[in-house]
Amino acid sequence: MSIHRRRSLGVLTSSLTLFLMVLVATPSWAAEKTRLRVDDYQIEAELTPHLHQISVRAKVKFTALQDLTVAVFELHNDLRVTKVLDEKNQPLSAERVTQDSTVRVPLPAGLSKDATTTLTFEYEGQLDSADNSPVPGLKLAYIGDDTSFLFYAGRWFPVSGFGLNRFTSTISVTVPAHMLVIGSGKMSASEAAASKKPNASVLPTKTFTFVSTKPSFPGTIVAGIFQEYKSDEAGMDLHVFFKPTHQPLAPAYTTTAVQEFTYYITLYGLPPSQKLNVVELPGDTLPYAWAPEIAGLAGPSITEKTNYRLLADAIAHQWWGVSVSPASKDDWWLSDGFSRYSEAMYVESAAGAAGLEEAVKDMSVGALAYDTVPLSSASKLDIFSTEFQSLATDKGAMILHMLRWVLGEDKYNKTMREFATEFAGKSASMDDFKTIAEKNYGDQLTWFFSQWLDSTGAPEFKLKYTTYRLGGSAAKEPASKEERTPGFRVTGEISQDLDLFRMPVNLRIDTDGKTENKRIEVVGTTSPFSIETFGRPRRISIDPDHHVLTNSSDVKLRSAILRGQALQQQGDLSAALTEFNKALDLNKNSSLAHYRVAEIFFLQRNYQSSANAYREAINGDGEPRWTEVWSRIQLGKIFDITGQRERAVNEYRQATQTNDNTFGALEEARKYLQKAYERPKEKQ
């Protein structure tokens, strides 16, 4: 299982964002109610990497949830079913439906509700591209010489109830003897004779067997040539599998993984297993992947500066996804949102309040970018759509962030730990979580969950206030602290447009003396307040620590940019440009919006307009900082394309003078100082 984040050099955006952009135009998984529950898999797979081939024999034990006449499973469209047997080894017919990547097996005798049976599937195929992926455009299953990966989401074995149906498994994978295989569960390995199958390798092979006895979501397999780095620090059984080029970075990632793993133990208790495999994935698949005992990171994200945020999210899924899983699609945020906010909490522990603030800003943008469907109705959307991922991941995380503010630190931590413990190894619903939260809060929280789960939108706060000097003079020094009396009173009101809104909000009053904080209960469109201070008020701010999801002008701007990037990745450049211009309507000086506009014009080969927009980015508000160095580089490319080498060199030099190496900018600039940029030739 996998889903979500960080930087991608090509578009200079977060990997989660990139992932969400790619996952579009997908079929509606689970649109048809699941009628069976898979209990166990017995899978034997043989990989022939040099031919990109896989052959599989899979025994699927399942239970009917209602009377069945046809058993339906999802299976990758590049896999051809050659045989299906019932539990008496009698052959059955199978219908392949490519539109929804399913295989339908009629059951001649039927299967009554609660009855259990086993089907055996034999199938084979070539997995060498994303052309027929269950998620169009995204490679989720691939067989190759350097690295092979078979994600659970790739449906490389017959799947039912994706992400909801917990199961046990025994998976044996045969590969060339020089390869390692990483999977979930207790592992054993044995040498095997060369395969006698046509086209199979005559070289020695090795079979790796993984036994998972705890129902969860095993089924993700990674095979390839890796350097292994081991650690038993803090009682962990940690294995880091990196490619030789990244092996020098393994110790740093090992240390970080141990820190994150142990941090989560202090928050949530023990995970299902103390074993963790951190695995390098190819750069043309997910930014990261997770499965029981597995945290996979795409090669480009493994940098000298440890990508601790991405790793933290992947590791958090050992609790939220592997241990506690969603009971329905509407509850998906209990996995992805919980992991996202766990990452944010680790960032806070490692980088302080400033780190958390940046994470919250990112989550706020994602939470409101596609806020057209309530999170409690997310099942109306496709699991792999941009909208679904935005809601489940970022809005789900923001709900936890706000709940932490409502409950207070101790009660919040108690709620999360109890939820993780009570539902360990089980599926859970939002109501299950709400029950535990209300118990610790000491009152009902219907108003909170109804507001953020069952509704859309967020407030935009406005503040009006008047300051009065009181009778006591603040200028005079009192004889003692006890004699001090307030010198000023601030009265005013907080307003916003949501009639049913209710949330506690912090008011911060900066004065000549001590800063005052006042927790105000904002209810309805207008909420009055009165606060007395000792020093003269100089500045009043609403929710300065970003405890509440708000639709501020900055969030609106960044949300428009996020939507534009998604459209750009889909190839709809005109619609993307419209979104970027919406961002500029909110802030004409936004360097990021100008940069994105410039990218569109560059892709359209409208080089003059692109150059103009890159210069606007350089002269804008400078947020984020990397827009300057990359605008310089892009201007250099434009001058190279148009035959103005001297001007191009000048831009590359100015790029190096920024000393900003975000996303490897300095290496990029130095490369084109040595050799002029050439526009890639179009594919025929």
Task: Please name every model-derived segment.
Residues 66, 272, 382, 389-486, ...:
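Amphipathic alpha-helical substructures
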Residues 81-85, 182, 445-446, 459-542:
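Beta-strand-rich binding/interaction modules
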Residues 142-143, 171, 209, 226-332, ...:
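Juxtacatalytic substrate-recognition/specificity segment
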Residues 24-55, 63, 82, 139-143, ...:
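N-terminal, polar/Ser/Thr-rich
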Residues 78-139, 195-203, 207, 524-536:
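A surface-exposed beta-strand-loop module
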Residues 122-226:
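Extended, low-hydrophobicity, Ser/Thr/Pro/Gly-biased non-transmembrane segments
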Residues 213, 287, 330-332, 336-402, ...:
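Acidic/His/Gly-enriched intrinsically disordered linker/tail segments
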